[in-house]
Amino acid sequence: MQKIEKPWGYEIIWAKTDKYVAKFLHINPNSRLSLQYHVNKEETIYVMSGQLRLQLGDESQESTVGPGGIVHVSPGKVHRFGAGDSFVMLCEVSTPELDDVVRLQDDYKR
């Protein structure tokens, strides 16, 4: 397992092969990831705890996904994950292109 600190929380990669990657994402309260898309990466997210603030496409499409909810993100789909007043824990399973991130907006100036 590999823990990677992020400005919004951390990731724990617990499986990595040439065909898929599985990781946990811990999003700190009142934090969010960048508004982004992936050219090739495809991912499915399972909400383990907390209330995921989800943006798909433009900002008017923000919704909340609770524990047990599943979100599929296809290549090219603009998205952002975030947390409200309490942390969010996600499980992500994706294709292995971990560096395939095009950031459109980022609170941390990356």
Give the ranges of each region predicted by the language model.
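Glycine- and acidic-residue-biased ligand/ion/polar-headgroup-sensing regions
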Residues: 40-53
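A short, N-terminal "cap"/entry segment at the start of jelly-roll beta-barrel domains
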Residues: 1-23, 34, 103-110
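Conserved short histidine dyad/triad with adjacent acidic residue
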Residues: 23-40
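Double-stranded beta-helix
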Residues: 4-6, 80-110
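Short acidic-glycine-tyrosine-enriched beta hairpin
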Residues: 58-78
